[in-house]
A protein has these predicted regions:
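C-terminal capping/extension of enzyme domains
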Residues: 1-18, 39-40, 47, 83-98, ...
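Unchanged
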Residues: 131-132, 209-233, 241-297
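Short N-terminal binding/cap micro-motifs at the start of the first secondary-structure element
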Residues: 17, 27-32, 197-199
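Internal catalytic-core helix/loop-beta-alpha segment
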Residues: 68-123
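Short, surface-exposed acidic-centric catalytic microdomains
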Residues: 30-90
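Short, well-ordered beta-to-alpha junction loops that form the rim of enzyme active sites
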Residues: 24, 111-116, 192-193
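A generic hydrophobic-segment detector
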Residues: 114-169, 268-311
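Conserved N-terminal beta-strand and adjoining loop/helix that marks the start
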Residues: 48, 169-187, 208-211
Length: 311
């Protein structure tokens, strides 16, 4: 993926990076050098080192060495201008940018300056972690490192770079989920929808384990709240999964255990308002319906798991 860009400054990208830094667009100095943040008065590379992202101070021409550290660099707009104020609204392509990020699937994107974020999403962000995400990629906004932002003290900008480095370490979370199958072989799933991006996906019933809870405690609570289901036996663990994803401005590393639960039949009747949890629907699915529908299903191998346990 590295270098595949319509700009004179190549993207520094690879699949599965920890963080991609996103500037607003190439300035003339960067375009001439074919390197990101190449203006010697730009503090990006110094801040990257002082915040602990790089073991030493890198030169802009060493930008592809960032990939070895799990880091990348791109721009919100590709057109070179004397300054970011010379950009037009049409220089930003949100759909193309999101496709670029989904293809790379990093843990996070850090926008170097509010204007890079604003140009893409037409929103005025605060500095720090954002509630918006792109798929399973979290978003973070840093102060600009441009010499035009020199009025913001270096130590203040360094504080935000350091906060980003700490934020990139996800919060560990234990979770339990139910592979709930009825006598017809249907599976009970909940539909999540991100409140800002609109990304939607279906997942098995379940959730995080609260302090002091056992798997059974948490699973009974979740099934009662999400489906009104109370009369059931909890079976063995039939699948485990680990996933890192953004939620409500945090990065979560979730350890999930899936218990097999068989029921005769059940009419779904949630006992709480699920909208604040991001849940928009709870329903039974047949394997044929799951195969035919187009929205994302988590875990990706759910059909295989169902078939392996549909005795």
């Amino acid at each position: 993926m590295a270098g595949s860009t319509p700009s004179s400054v190549p993207d520094v990208l690879a699949p599965g990076l920890t963080c991609i830094f996103c500037g607003i667009n190439p300035g003339r100095v960067s375009a001439a050098a074919a390197a990101h943040f190449a203006n010697p008065r730009n503090d990006f590379w110094r801040l990257l080192h002082d915040a602990g992202f790089t073991p030493r101070l890198y030169d802009p021409q060493e930008q592809f060495s960032l990939l070895e550290l799990g880091l990348g660099v791109t721009n919100a707009a590709y057109r070179t201008t004397p300054g970011s104020g010379d950009l037009r609204r049409g220089d930003f392509d949100q759909a193309e940018f999101e496709a670029r990020i989904r293809a790379a699937a990093p843990r996070a994107v850090a926008f170097v300056g509010k204007e890079a974020y604003r140009g893409l999403f037409n929103e005025r962000p605060e500095l720090g972690a954002q509630r918006r995400s792109i798929g399973r990629t979290g978003l973070f906004v840093l102060p600009s490192t441009s010499p035009a932002n020199a009025a913001v003290p270096y130590q203040e900008r360094l504080r935000w770079f350091t906060e980003l480095r700490l934020w990139l370490e996800p919060v560990e979370r234990q979770a339990v989920r139910g592979l709930v199958l009825d006598r017809e072989g249907q599976v009970l799933l909940v539909r999540f929808e991100h409140p800002i991006s609109g990304d939607a996906w279906w997942a098995t019933v379940g959730g995080g384990i609260d302090p002091g809870e056992t798997d059974e405690d948490a699973l009974r609570r979740e099934l009662r709240e999400e489906a009104g289901l109370a009369d059931f036996e909890i079976g063995p663990v039939v699948h485990t999964r680990e996933a890192t994803f953004p939620w409500a401005g945090q990065l979560i590393h979730q350890h999930e255990r899936f218990h097999l639960i068989r029921v005769e039949t059940h009419e779904v009747t949630p006992t709480i308002d699920l909208v604040p949890e991001g849940v928009t629907d709870v329903r039974w699915w047949s394997p044929a319906e799951l195969t035919a529908q187009s929205e994302e299903v988590v875990p990706e191998d759910l059909l295989q798991i169902i078939r392996a346990n549909d005795a």
